[in-house]
Amino acid sequence: MTSVRRAKITALGTYVPPRVLSNFDLEKMVDTTNQWILERTGIRERHLVDKGVAASDLAVEAAKKCLANRGIEAAEVECIVVGTVTPDMMYPSTACLVQHKLGIPNAWGFDVSAGCSGFLFSLTTGAKFIESGQYKKVLVIGSDVNSSMIDYTDRATCIIFGDGAGAVLLEPTEDGEDVGVMDHIHQVEGVGGQYLYMPGGGSLNPASHETIDQKMHYVHQDGQNVFKYAVKKMSEMTEKVLKRNSLTGTDVDCFIAHQANKRIIVATAERLKMPMEKVIINIEKYGNTTAGTIPLAMQTALDEGKLKKGSNVLLAAVGAGFTSGATLLRWAF
């Protein structure tokens, strides 16, 4: 009998910059209060980079921790997939910069732009490379410097986002191992592009005095429509992937959702009839770090002892685009 080859997560590493911006700091910057932010988002503070620190820098720090935790050299990595919407520059890709900074001699890689679903999309992509049998070590990273595209006079967005990164190493399962990435469902619905976007800097609106004056290089968000879609879609995607695998919310040992808003996560868990002790919420400390949220939440789950070998783990995300996804995996260590 031949075992099914799956991709398993064998190591994890995360990084957030040391500088913290609290709700009380924001009270001095815009018309808001700590209580208002907490009640509507669940966020108390977020970490921000200093000037000159980019997405590749956070990615490299997370990757170094990941590889050290696995006890391998960077040179063993064969492929790098980076989920980000805040690349250091339009090109070269963040993956190229990470490869160079880590000193990996024979890897290839690329970036995945899927908003807050970026880590999930990257994880699936990396898993498929492992499943193909062509690669044995794929580095998957989610890294975003959201502060680079936030208008800190706009209270609708500046209270939400933070900077951070996380990395996982994917390797093939051994014969007889029933762990790894079990299933996934992803979707894009471009009709949602009008609700969360950054219009400046691309080929449609290249950088100019006009785009700067019109604040087109900042995030624009219709929070109400994004919230409604996220609550509906995250529940829908998680229910689909569970049903396809003959599981229910009670079979899940750990639910790790994109940390966009505490109310979205709670609403999804309630719809799945999942006890809140199985739900990972760390948005209070980090805010929304876009592609960084899920690996950062994985680290929280590990630290809290909620991830053990064989645990059924459900991941879910909704992001700009709209993009959405749910991934079912069985924890490997």
From Swiss-Prot:
Keywords: Acyltransferase, Cytoplasm, Fatty acid biosynthesis, Fatty acid metabolism, Lipid biosynthesis, Lipid metabolism, Multifunctional enzyme, Transferase. It comes from the Bacteria. It catalyses: malonyl-[ACP] + acetyl-CoA + H(+) = 3-oxobutanoyl-[ACP] + CO2 + CoA. Pfam families: ACP_syn_III, ACP_syn_III_C. GO terms for molecular function: 3-oxoacyl-[acyl-carrier-protein] synthase activity; beta-ketoacyl-acyl-carrier-protein synthase III activity. Residues 259-263 are annotated as: ACP-binding. InterPro entries: ACP_syn_III_C, ACP_syn_III_N, FabH, Thiolase-like. It is found in: Cytoplasm. GO terms for biological process: fatty acid biosynthetic process; secondary metabolite biosynthetic process. SUPFAM superfamilies: Thiolase-like. Pathway: Lipid metabolism; fatty acid biosynthesis. Its EC number is 2.3.1.180. One of its GO terms (cellular component) is cytoplasm. The active site is at C116, H258, N288. Homodimer. Belongs to the thiolase-like superfamily. FabH family. Catalyzes the condensation reaction of fatty acid synthesis by the addition to an acyl acceptor of two carbons from malonyl-ACP. Catalyzes the first condensation reaction which initiates fatty acid synthesis and may therefore play a role in governing the total rate of fatty acid production. Possesses both acetoacetyl-ACP synthase and acetyl transacylase activities. Its substrate specificity determines the biosynthesis of branched-chain and/or straight-chain of fatty acids. The last Arg residue of the ACP-binding site is essential for the weak association between ACP/AcpP and FabH. This is Beta-ketoacyl-[acyl-carrier-protein] synthase III. It comes from Koribacter versatilis (strain Ellin345).
